[in-house]
């Protein structure tokens, strides 16, 4: 079996599910696929946020400087941006189960290698410059692997859910990054505090391997590959004009739509602030506000938890309070996130007040 055959979208199964079992089988497989992909995507973020937790120990041991850590982090973000754009198109044609599992498995392997490299650093071991180069290359590779998580997860919604239910399930799926960040800051932070920064990468790798297994065990590519009818036959929904178009033609329409590029630019600015807090918040709290590692990671973990609340709250606010107007809540949330971030950066306060600042910030960004 070639690489193309391995990753291309699954063919319909010749063994059809008996009609009397179709409804029950579809519901069971749909739920397994959705919750499997959702849980696994949260573990993608554990493999992405590990570096954010170990920055101060790396600086304290004289292995890397803050500037070098910034370059390493940028390697992931730049590669991730390109990869997410490209993989978003590629995933339309792929077996999303294998595609998603591959990305998380290699991301876990990258974390494991980075943790292992720490055991070879020292006066008689690897020099700091070599560690820096290795980390930058590996973290860039991780960026590409991370870009293989969201596209297949979103595509699973279109393959398994009718149009009328996709919004609800997407709001749940889109909250998983905050769940992953929360797990990373709490669990990885505890491990690093107890055993050292090397084990922060190792525990992230373990989480990634668990996530890969979850995908392989619970996620299914398409209803047709399991002997079920297509989602349109299952739901009784009629195909729209767009549904009947070839994937390539739809992709061209998306690229030519100016609104997509405006949203993309807005999203880019939101992510700059989001990753500033998620990626550097722990180090900022340690250096600028003298919090120990355990408390710093706990504070940023609250940020992630309230991001979930904001994401889930967004749909309800715009539908119920603002009567379907998406612009007003977006503007209000943007102003609120600015105020909260300014308080976090410039206001004083202890443990509780800093939890309040970052929670307010993530609540607002979650709505955005």
Residue spans of the language-model regions?
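Cytoplasmic helix-loop-helix junction between adjacent transmembrane helices
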Residues: 138-179
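C-terminal ends and interior cores of transmembrane alpha-helices
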Residues: 105-128, 335-349
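Cytoplasmic membrane-interface "Motif A"-like loop-to-helix N-cap segments
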Residues: 93-104, 319-334
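Helix-loop-helix hairpin linking two adjacent transmembrane segments in secondary transporters
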Residues: 173-223
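Juxtamembrane intracellular "pre-TM" segments in multi-pass secondary transporters
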Residues: 16-27, 225-263, 288
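C-terminal transmembrane helical hairpin of 12-TM major facilitator-type secondary transporters
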Residues: 324-368
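Helix-to-loop junctions at the C-terminal end of transmembrane segments
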Residues: 83-95, 311-324
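Extracytoplasmic gate region of multi-pass secondary transporters
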Residues: 51-55, 257-312
């Amino acid at each position: 079996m070639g690489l193309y055959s391995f990753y291309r979208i699954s063919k319909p199964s010749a063994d059809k599910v008996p009609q009397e079992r179709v409804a029950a089988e579809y519901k069971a497989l749909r739920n397994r696929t959705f919750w499997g992909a959702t849980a696994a995507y949260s573990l993608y973020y554990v493999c992405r946020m590990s570096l954010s937790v170990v920055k101060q120990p790396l600086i304290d041991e004289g292995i890397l400087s803050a500037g070098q850590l910034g370059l390493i982090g940028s390697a992931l973000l730049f590669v991730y941006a390109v990869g997410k754009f490209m993989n978003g198109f590629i995933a339309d044609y792929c077996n999303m189960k294998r595609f998603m599992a591959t990305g998380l498995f290699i991301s876990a392997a990258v974390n494991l290698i980075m943790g292992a490299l720490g055991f070879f650093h020292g006066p008689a071991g690897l020099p700091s410059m070599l560690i820096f180069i290795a980390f930058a290359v590996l973290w860039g590779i991780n960026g590409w692997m991370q870009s293989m998580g969201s596209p297949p997860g979103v595509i699973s919604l279109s393959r398994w859910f009718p149009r009328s239910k996709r919004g609800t399930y997407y709001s749940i799926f889109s909250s998983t990054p905050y769940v992953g960040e929360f797990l990373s800051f709490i669990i990885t932070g505890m491990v690093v505090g107890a055993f050292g920064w090397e084990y922060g990468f190792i525990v992230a790798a373990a989480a990634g391997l668990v996530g890969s297994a979850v995908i392989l065990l619970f996620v299914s590519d398409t209803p047709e590959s399991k002997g079920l009818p297509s989602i349109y036959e299952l739901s009784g929904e009629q195909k729209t004009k767009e549904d009947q178009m070839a994937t390539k033609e739809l992709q061209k329409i998306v690229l030519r739509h100016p609104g997509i590029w405006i949203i993309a630019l807005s999203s880019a600015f939101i992510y700059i602030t989001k990753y500033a807090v998620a990626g550097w918040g722990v180090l900022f709290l340690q250096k600028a506000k003298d919090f120990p590692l355990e408390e710093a990671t706990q504070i940023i973990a609250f940020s992630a938890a309230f991001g979930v609340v904001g994401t889930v709250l967004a749909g309800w606010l715009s539908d119920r309070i603002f009567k379907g107007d998406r612009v007003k809540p977006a503007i209000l949330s943007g102003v609120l996130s600015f105020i909260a971030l300014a308080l976090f950066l410039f206001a004083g306060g202890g443990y509780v007040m800093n939890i309040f600042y970052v929670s307010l910030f993530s609540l607002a960004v979650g709505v955005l």
